[in-house]
């Protein structure tokens, strides 16, 4: 009984495999690649807000560092710059110019 069931399943599997091998895609599928989409369709799916993007890179624009002007002031003073290398910018700026 098991052999007969196994033989029937193998015959059914063989029919399914040979039937799919000879089948051709339908007219709707053959005109369009199912795995590929056009650039326009792809960009409609993945839309990003453009307000924070570099125009040439497509990466988000970094927010300006509020401490950058103070860091430049400390870099112009050789003593502050040297101390910043040892203890960090914020502490060196605080020691030379007051609170950050």
Curated annotation (Swiss-Prot):
InterPro entries: GLA-like_dom_SF (IPR035972), GLA_domain (IPR000294), Osteocalcin (IPR039176), Osteocalcin/MGP (IPR002384). It comes from the Eukaryota. Residues 24-51 form a propeptide. Ca(2+) 1 binds at residue 68. GO terms for molecular function: calcium ion binding; hormone activity; hydroxyapatite binding; structural constituent of bone. Disulfide bonds join 74-80. PROSITE patterns: GLA_1, GLA_2. Ca(2+) 2 binds at residues 72, 75. The keyword Signal applies. Residues 1-23 form the signal peptide. One of its GO terms (biological process) is regulation of testosterone biosynthetic process. It is found in: Secreted. Ca(2+) 3 binds at residues 75, 81. Its main location: secreted. The keyword Transcription does not apply. The modification 4-carboxyglutamate is found at residues 68, 72, 75. Residues 52-98 form the Gla domain. Keywords: Biomineralization, Calcium, Cleavage on pair of basic residues, Disulfide bond, Gamma-carboxyglutamic acid, Hormone, Metal-binding, Secreted, Signal. Gamma-carboxyglutamate residues are formed by vitamin K dependent carboxylation by GGCX. These residues are essential for the binding of calcium. Decarboxylation promotes the hormone activity. One of its GO terms (cellular component) is cytoplasm. Belongs to the osteocalcin/matrix Gla protein family. The carboxylated form is one of the main organic components of the bone matrix, which constitutes 1-2% of the total bone protein: it acts as a negative regulator of bone formation and is required to limit bone formation without impairing bone resorption or mineralization. The carboxylated form binds strongly to apatite and calcium. The uncarboxylated form acts as a hormone secreted by osteoblasts, which regulates different cellular processes, such as energy metabolism, male fertility and brain development. Regulates of energy metabolism by acting as a hormone favoring pancreatic beta-cell proliferation, insulin secretion and sensitivity and energy expenditure. This is Osteocalcin. It comes from Pongo pygmaeus. The lineage of its organism: Eukaryota, Metazoa, Chordata, Craniata, Vertebrata. The gene is BGLAP.
